[in-house]
Amino acid sequence: MKLTDDSHLSNPLAAREAALVAAFRERSHPTVAERLHLAKRAHTTRRVAFGADVRLLSDVAPRSGDLVLARVDALGQHDKLQDPSGRRVSLFVGDEIVVAYGHRYAPSQFEALVPEDLGPCHLAAGGGIAARVVAANTRMSEPTALTPLGLLADARGERLNLAGAALAPRALPAQRPPVFALLGASMDSGKTTAAAALIRGLSRLGLRVGAAKVTGTGASGDPFLFRDSGAREVLDFVDAGCATTYLAPHEQIEAISATLIAHLCEAGSDVIVVEVADGLLQRETRALLEASFSHRAFDGVLFAAADALGAAQGVRWLRERGHNVLAATGLMTASPLARREAEEVCDAAVRGVEQLESPLVAAELRSRVR
């Protein structure tokens, strides 16, 4: 696919239409607040309140987490936007949308970076991430093209950033319920499905389950699945003030994890299930799991993989770093043959989704952590 910043300008008719719409909007002189009221707002921005005195900043360098009003110039891979409620809203050329800047790491989709200016960029994720795509999976269509119209700011001219609406920071509690972590070999290895199944199994025991996604790209799907599976309280890194966690400092990843776990404890959780995005070799995931913090934060881990070899190597990698590996799971358990291979070579019990949903299996896993 072609990843040029001006690809959306190649259609002269579309360019003229966009100019005409912009001219009519200019004549009507809507306030920024009125434009924001009509704009389609992304799920990533759900915690930020807009006042009537909101303004737009131009000629500034965006930062990760900054909110931006942008115009859709060409539809591509993402032709829908998840709104604050999680509904997938259809997009049209000329729409104004409110999204958050953020880096994106998604091997099955895009790698995208926050640009150094407010020039043309892309909708890098359906949850509402503005960034400039620098690499794409060959299966992807062209990214949806955006023109930023300005960063959102308050009456004092201070930019609105997700960090300003975050949960209060917390340290990792000294006394807390057990925390299970779902890890994986890669993106799309079955982590989220396994996490949801474990939540279901623990809930069927009568436990109050809290769930969190501590790294990844802001979107509604995974948290909604956790809640549907029985979690009483669900949080993610957006609640901790980040649109995405790609390229975030390691200290920030630890702070996000501690804050989310602490707030789930305060909500009265009997047990907590945490998902860490992507695979063991991804930058932030690897740093987190190689740090001593992860041993204090996670009492037991389950590892998801798409095949037996990945499961065996992942379990070994985690054990070498001192983690309490409770089971291997993931996509490979959907195939009886792959599951059989994993059972032969993996130094951990192999548990499929249907087993993790069982209160008997959930009770057995619960008994193997503090």
Which positions does each model-derived feature cover?
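NTP-binding/hydrolysis catalytic cores, primarily Walker-type P-loop NTPases
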Residues: 45-61, 79, 345-346, 353-370
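Short, glycine-rich nucleotide/cofactor-binding loops
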Residues: 75-77, 184-190, 305-307
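Charge-biased, low-complexity intrinsically disordered regions
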Residues: 83-85, 116, 120, 204-208, ...
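Conserved catalytic-core segment of NTP-binding enzymes
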Residues: 124-163, 225, 250-266, 271, ...
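N-terminal phosphate/diphosphate-binding loop that engages ATP/GTP or pyrophosphate donors
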Residues: 200-244, 251, 316-320, 336-346
